[in-house]
Amino acid sequence: MNTIYLIGDSTCHKNSRKTYPQVGWGQVFSMYVNDNYKIVNLAENGRSSKSFLEEGLFKKCEQNIKNGDFLFIQFGHNDEKEDVLIHTDPFTTYQEYLSYYINVAKKNNATPVLLSSIYRRHFDDNGIIKENCHLDYPKAMEELAIKENVIYIDMCELTKNMLIELGDEPSKKLFMNFSANKYKNYPEGKQDNTHLRIKGAKKICEMLVEQISENPTLNIILKK
């Protein structure tokens, strides 16, 4: 059996009951993948392309990835933060860390796939989505994908357009944005426009699966 490795941050991470109703898209991805593949979700909260590697979180994948496996790589949300332990620069260190993951996959005859970050649900007071929420990281990832001849799926642009289509208020149901006393873990409510609830996680997967289905290298992983 082959493996699909997922590496990234909290938007992909497998959550526990303690953080319910927060759900990473990686938690529900198996619903769309056929039984010939197992999913190993290594994504961790708060990690960047830099800290994920330097904390040793990539070791399990690096030691086990093999011919026929896939490596889905999604970083960017935390790379922009100023903390020196996690920050990367889009066109230098960010690309260097992404290249490391890509090269590990390639040397083991696995397929690396670059995914840009899902767009933050940031609307202005007029209900207009804020532009350039993720700075130059998606552009830098796309540039690297072209250079390395790697599959690139622009989840940032796709999810931005989805948010525009849904609008400010309706899109709240996809995110950890809700009123008080709705969930036991968050009695005071939550106004989090980055992390997903189950509807959001499924929506992200549906959009990702649509892109995968159109790619002959990737669509072999999907359920018929």
Q: Model features per residue range: what roles?
A:
Residues 1-44, 59-71:
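Serine-esterase "nucleophile elbow" of acetyl-processing enzymes
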Residues 9, 42-47, 86-87, 126:
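Short, basic, glycine/proline-bearing loop/turn elements
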Residues 2-7, 44-47, 130-142:
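Short, charged N-terminal helix-start/capping segments
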Residues 56-202, 206-224:
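Alpha-helical cap/lid subdomain in secreted, periplasmic
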Residues 11, 51, 193-195:
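Residue-level preference for alpha-helix termini and adjacent loops
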Residues 14, 49-50, 81:
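Glycine/Thr-rich phosphate-binding loops of Rossmann-like dinucleotide-binding domains
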